[in-house]
Amino acid sequence: MYHAIVRRKLRRAFADINAGRYDGIVAQFAPQHRHAMPGRHALAGERRSVESTARWYARLQRLLPGLAFDVRAIVVGGMPWRTTAAVAWDDRFTLPDGTPGSNTGVHEFELRWGRVHSLVIHCDSQRLQHYCDRLVERGVAEAGAEPITDVR
């Protein structure tokens, strides 16, 4: 039963992003957590505070407006005090210049008592870098910005 509740909460979180409701996403993170995305692009890096994670989601929304996920699978294991979950997805979006884009990946979660303590987002980072480069060419300077990170 617990795993079904976690799957439902994760589906709801992705539905919120699909609907452009990002504010509730950050509220699900523990005050101290790990939010990371590998790569060398404006959405890469690692964050450990709610403030920096909120800035990251704001940047995501600006760079990839209309981002929508198609969740393919959700796998959940563990107990409430240490739950792991993986969400496999395909996404689609339209760049600010009107170009359609897409990617595929996995969100890897560690939850404790319903709060996100770790989220690592794995996707085709070269593909994402290509989209960021395209945005920079079209004058979107933020797409070429340094990653938002508070880890030194």
Where are these regions (language model features)?
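Short, low-complexity N-terminal intrinsically disordered segments enriched in polar/charged residues
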Residues: 1-31, 138-152
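A short hydrophobic beta-strand element
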Residues: 81-91
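Hydrophobic pocket/interface hotspot
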Residues: 13, 25-26, 33, 49, ...
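Short beta-strand edge/turn micro-motifs at domain boundaries
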Residues: 104-133
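Hydrophobic/aromatic beta-strand elements that line small-molecule binding cavities or substrate pockets
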Residues: 71-76, 90-92, 104-110, 120
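Short beta-strand segments enriched in hydrophobic/aromatic residues
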Residues: 29-30, 89-93, 123
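Short, cysteine-centered beta-strand-loop-beta hairpins and adjacent loop/turn segments enriched
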Residues: 63-66, 92-102
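A solvent-exposed, acidic/Ser-Thr-rich amphipathic alpha-helical stretch
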Residues: 23, 28-83
